[in-house]
Amino acid sequence: LGGGPGTYLVEFLRRWPGLHGAIYDLPATLRVARRILNERAPWAVARSDFREVDYTAGELPGPVDAIFMSNIIHSEDEAANRGLMRKCFRALAPHGILVIKDHIMNAGLTEPAAGAVFSLYLLLTTRGRDYSFEEVSGWLREAGFSDIRLEPLPSPPFTSSMVLARKF
């Protein structure tokens, strides 16, 4: 969801040869993704769907086995993120998994430091900010998810973490 130029999609497809992937994003982004993937990874295009989806409007396509969101929740306010978690839950097949990659902050919203500084920028440019694991896991529980866990990514190079949640 919000697959951008397809960077993560290509790596997922490379890692799992039997996987069929999809990018759900806005029309302009899909045009860029298709151009880049046709040039650099045409094999990935054959194993992927490209669908125009505005996650802020309407339901998400489904059922799907997994949803990967990278750097989306920090652009939205709490109410929009709660709604997005509910949409993801409805789009997932039973036993599906949601993976959220973003700056996931500590309870005091002070670490990681890069996320705290980025939140200042977000407050000026979006409706969002970086959220704590407690906040994100609360939205996920409200939406019906379980087995919610935080998986930090190696730092450096990453300043992000992943939150994983299951639909049972």
What are the language-model segments listed below?
Residues L1-F168:
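Alpha-helical subdomain
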